[in-house]
Structures are given as C-alpha cells and as structure tokens.
Amino acid sequence: MRLFHFVSIVSLFTIMTMVSSVSAEEQYLEFLQGLRDKNYHDTALQYLDQIAADKATPKEIQELIPFERAMTLMMFSRTQTQPEEQEETLNLALAQLALFTKQYPNHPMAGTANTERGKIILEKAEVEGRKAQSPAEQNNKKAHQEAARKLVAQARDIFQKAYNLHEKTWKSFPATFIDKQKEPERYEARAKAEIQFMSAQLDLAQCTYAEAQTYDPGSADFNRLLKKAAEEYAKIHERYRSQVGGLYARMWQGKCFEEQGELGQALGIYNELLGHPGKSSAIKGLKDNCLQFRLICLNDEKKKDYQLVINEAEEWLKDNRSRSRTAIGQGITWELARAQEALANQESTKKGDQDRILRQALANARFVNAFRGKYRDVSRLMVGRINAKIQGNSGGDPQDFATAYGLGQDRNKQTKTLKDKLAAAKTPADKKKAQVELTQFMEETARILRIALKLADNKTDPKELDHARFLLSYTYYNLRRSYECAILAEFVAKSDDKVNGGMSLDAAYLALAGYLQAYNDSPK
C-alpha cells in the first residue's frame, strides 16, 4: 500500500502553519497545488521555472521555489511506474531540498524541509519495496528489503530529532488556558507547536508502518510491526481525537487492521470516520481516503460485497466529477472496476447483465489506465482480460481510419436516441438504467474515435481528421470529461482555421463550453 495520501496530507499541517495569509503568496501556491492535485506535475514544474524567471514574482515565493519544486518532484514520482525512474526523481527532489536549506538556512520553512527530506527517504524505501516485489528481482529480494529497512531507519532518525525538538517547544508552553483574544500571538505559537508535535508523532508511527512493508505480507515480522504501528496510531488518536491529525491516525490504525486481515475492525473504524460530522476540506479529504480503504475491504475475497462497492463508488464519482483524476479518484474508480469485473464473473449474475457490467468495468479500467502510476499495469491487464471475453462479439476493432471514422459518425448520431430514451424514463430505476446505457454507449464511441485518430496517416483527409477530433471532443463534453473536451476542441479551433474555417468557430464554442462545464463541476 502506497503511503502518499497520508504523507501529502500530514505535510500540510506544518506548511499551513508557516504560510502567512498574504494574498499574493496564496495565489501562487494555490495555483501550483491545483496543478499538482490534477497530476499535471510536468506543467507544475514548468510553472515554477516560469515564475522563477519572472522578476515580478514576490521575494517570498522566489525563496520557496526550490522547496516547492522538491514537493512537486516527490508527487511526480508517485505517478511513475518504473522503480528506477522513481528513484531518480526522488533524488532530484532531495537535491532541491538541499539547495533550499543551503540558500535559506534561516528560512521559517527550513525545519519543514528537513522533515520533508525524511518523507522522501520513506518514499525511496517504498521504491526498494517495489523492486523486491518484482519477479525479475527475486534473486535480490532480500537485499532490496534490507535496503528499504535502512532507508526507513534513516527517516526515523530525522523524525526522532524533529520529535525531540517539537516536544521541547510544546512543553515550554504552560498547560493553562491562553485567551486567543487577549494573547493572540502566544495562542497561535502554542497552536503551531502542538501541530508540529502531533505531526512528528504521526511521522514516527508512519515509519513503523513503512518498516512492516519491508517484510513479506503475513510473515511474523510483518504482523508484529503492523500491530505496533496500530498501537502507536491509537495513542495519537486518543490524545488528539478532536483534531484532524488524530483522525488520520485513527484511519491508519484501521489500515493496519485491514492489512492483518481483521476486516471487521478496519471497517468499523472507516465507518466511524465516514460518519464524522465535519465539513471542512481536511475532513472531506479524510473521508475520501476512508471510502477508498472501505471499498478495498468490501472487494476482499472474505467480503465479496461487489454491488455495494459499485453503488458507493458510483455515488462518489457522481458527486466528485472534478476529482476523478486525482489519486483518490483513480483509486475509487479502480475499486469500482474491480467490483464490476468480479460481479460480472459471478455465476449468479444473469448472462444478459454480464456483458453490460463487463463493458462498464472495461470503461473504468481504461480511464484509470490513461494515468501514470500504481494502477496502470493492473488496469492494462484487466483491459486485456475483459477484451478477450467481449471482443469476439463485435468482430474486432476497425483496422483503418475510414472505417473507424464512419463508425464514430454513426454512433454520434445514435446518441440522440439514447438521450431521448433517458429523458422519457419515468421511474428512478428506469432513469438509472437509461443513464448507464447512454454513458456506456458514449464511452465506446469515444474509444472508436480514438482508434480513428491513431489510424490516421499522411494520406488522411485533414478535414475528416479534424472532424473526428471534433466528434471526440463533443463526446467528451457529453461524458462531462470537460478538460479533455476543452483542450481537444481548442486544438481543432486553432488548427482547423487553415483547413476548414467553418468548423473552427464551432470548435471554439465547444472549448468554451468545456471550460464552463469544468468550472461548474468544480468544488464550490
């Protein structure tokens, strides 16, 4: 299990206490974080290069650029599939942190940078763990596991020093009440010290969890360390149960139970946290993590509660369209695909429903497979499995542009019939069935049009090629894949003017509609 959801969120505790409420600074960092949340890490790195070269960039932001570049590289590494590439990216991140602390040793974020160094080292330990799991590295498995343990020990040493420092700072404040109105600076200082002390405790507990991952699942050392980590998380939760950090500790206590096979205890904790009344963005992020972990439990062989996974995952994706591309969104979509494939393969599923459910699983697996990261390989295998079952029914995919383009045009015309069917549906059950049918049909239309674009060559009519792009963009719009719609339509609007000016205006309108839809679907 990757650590990044926890690592990223816990990192925010200290950062939030250090960044002042200067609007200009918030503007730069908020935009940067938005790019990273969407997994546009290459664009985020380009943005950092751009503002680094811009003389108008505030001094406070200029100083933070090496630090933010390191954070971006660390997040980027989580989307890479090859351990060697991940290791190289993480080393670049460490170099940027070293540059930051060298250039600005007295910067308020210098301490945070050192803590983040420990977290990057933990990420490197996970990379070694991935190497140990590789079939090609089985002869070196023990060596990779030992290397991972050494890296965890290095990270623990960094976190222990931070713990000692933050504990001392925290204990320097009296345990008595501090009036926020009368002593605002003192109140804020103690609150900041408490957050840093809590984060240090979480980091140490995370080291114990990470060390468990360096042993084979189910082994005595694996279970021993997971039990120890669960106890450490429990103590943190007991101390900070009313704070976000304490709630995250509770969630990771549940994760430790889950990985020991104690699904009942894990689900009890996840359900408890999902029922938390909080509405803040931090609590929402916590609940999203808990939902993903809950779906993993429900998909387990011991539970096989596939229909419940489908219901809960589809509900989350419907309510969080703009977040489907995030790490959490990809994880939830992957659990949805797993549940759909498993449900379709159950003997109790009617044959008439099997093909429909398999095609839904196929669409979700393809969506996840479009992103770099931990789900790419497993989703590729799923796509292959499902295709092997349903490919023969359709006679295979088109083998030339003209056939694929013509099929895409025909399917685009048929979409209206399915939309009318949805509009005419009376009962909620009929509406849901019609919506599923429409979505599935449009996903297949998009796939056919993508095949057409891949089959295009230098003999393809430029007008037909741009029209195929336009149809694909329009299909994306109907699927509410707004970013894909806007980017592709904007490309057509700019390129088609030289070929067929009549389509460029329509494409420009479609691009604007895509951006507007993306804005309307974004969290308010």
Please provide the spans of the model-predicted regions:
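Positively charged n-region of N-terminal signal peptides that target proteins for export
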Residues: 1-6
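Bacterial N-terminal signal peptides
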Residues: 7-18
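Acidic, polar-rich low-complexity tracts and alpha-helical solenoid repeat scaffolds
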Residues: 21-524
